[in-house]
Structures are given as structure tokens and as C-alpha cells.
Amino acid sequence: MCGIAGFAKQSNAQTPEQLEVIRQITKNLLIESEIRGTHSTGIAIIDECKNPLIFKSLKKSSNFVKSKDWKRKIVPEISLESSVVLGHTRFATHGSKSLRNAHPFNCGSIIGTHNGMIFNHEDISVNKKRVYEVDSEAVFALFDANNNLQECLDEIYGDYALAWTRDNKNTLHLLREDGRPCHYVYWSEARVLFYASTKEILESAIEDACIEEDDGKGTAYIYDELWSLYSEEIHTLDVDKLYTFNTHKFTDKELVYEEKSYVTNSLEANYIMEHNYNNFNYDSFGYSQYYKEDWEKTDCDSCSKKIDYEDIIYNEDKKSYICYDCEYKVNSELDIQESM
């Protein structure tokens, strides 16, 4: 079980006050999503005018949003020009607990996050020279290699809720099958859509932002808009439907989007029976190995401090690991991973 959460908004359509609230709700969404995964936290920020930024950390989300990188590097990038933000909290199943395996994944034209389990990810043939350790990365690599979504879904057996963007930086895609939840709500005045794995996560994130505004940090009209948003109906994604949100079409009256039905192989039992997995159980996916508490340490090349791996943040845009203490690059070749 993982948490997916984020937003899609029309660029340059918000007031500075609305932008601050969007930042606060984004932070709250990650914190509330911690209940769905504590092994890593990640966020992708997509801007129509520049290259996407992806930040990953082995911190749980409540600690991630307290980090220096969150305050100094991530929050400023959530700007008026931002169009899509993809957030993720991971509970590791396939693949070790490492920054390399943390979401979001950048696979060519695709940046995506996934909640669920793909049972045949080792059978997905995208690159014969590459075996994907994480099922989620295999899915997005498949999406990148084939623009025909139905053909991609025909290859996938498992359960999933997916959030991704393609080359079109102003468009968010959401898709789920019956085994995984996903919900969204639209703030019309700010022309922004928020989404999360559960209705409760969305409600809590918005309610906490309302309380922040009530403490005198905001203005009266923002406070009124937020409570209006809190009372707005939270929508559930229909099963096996692709929702495409083009932020250029967002209005201050209604949410305009497209939806299209697909056929999915979502019943995990079918795949297990078909492949005669008589010994299928949670240990097949390595749950038991993720409860070890001892973390390896590494030396920072700049400040020579011994650092826990969870205190290092990976900046995917710069392909480098950043020391939490001195904020300088650690070692670009380092594969940070929990010792097993």
C-alpha cells in the first residue's frame, strides 16, 4: 500500500494568497498520506516553461516536509507557473528501500506514481537489457514505449491507482482499477484540482489548511473559499476509466476533463491461478525484510559528517545526493539502500 497525492492547476491563474494555500495543502497531503507508506517520500514538480524537478527521500513524509530542502528548494518551485505536482509515500513491496526505487519515476516521456502491486512486472518486456526491480517503474517504462494505453494494460496483471504526465506538461492522467482507491476535488476559484488515495486524506489536508487560515495567517476571502472547498463534493474515480485533466481547460466555474474506459486485468487471483502460485503469500514480496531498523551510514565528502541514509535527499534533476546538514553533494554514484 502506498499513497499518491498532488494537484493539477492552470498556470498563472492564482493570487499569491491562493498559491500559499496550494503549497500548504500539498504539504498536508503528503503528511496525511504517511499512513499509507513510510519507507520513502517523493515529489515531482512539472512546469510548462522548464524541466521537471523530482525530489526523493527515505524520510517519512512528516519529516520530509520539515527538511531544509523542502523549505528552501521544493516549496519555492511550487509556483504560479507550476502545472502538475505528483506526490508519493511508499510502502516498499517489490524492490528494496532505496532512493533509486522511490517514486516518482521518470521514464522517458513519462513521470508517474503508483499505488498497488503488479504481479507480472518481471514479464513486462520493454528493454531486454534492463530488469526493473520495482513493478511501478516497469509500468511507466511500458507506457513510455507504447502510446497505446489499452495494449499496455493488456500486459499488466495486478492492482493499481496511477497518476502520471506525458510530454504534455499541462495534463494530468489518473487511472485506477477496482482494487485501489483514488479521489479528487476541484477548487474552482483557484482553478486547481487536488487528488489523493482516499477521501479522508483530502478532507484532512483541506481542513488543516482551513485551520491555518483561521489562525490569522490568511485573508477573509481565502478563508471563505477554503471552507467552500471543504464542503465541496469529493469525487471518486470510476473504475477502469482514464481521467485526463488538461489544465488549460480549467475554468472558475467548473472542472472540464475527459474520460475514457479501458479493459484491465485487475483480478490478482486470475494471474496467481494461471501461473500456479501455490505458495503465494506476503513474504513472496519481501514484507518481512522491511522491518529492520539499522540504517547504514556514509561520509559526506564536504563536511565529513557521518550521515544516516534517511538524512540524504536525492535531487533527480541534478542526479546527485544532497547532505541534509551542509546541503552539498555527497556522492553521485552512491546507491542509497537499507542494509538487509
Each language-model region and where it sits:
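Conserved short alpha-helical segments that host acidic/polar catalytic motifs at enzyme active sites
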Residues: 1-340
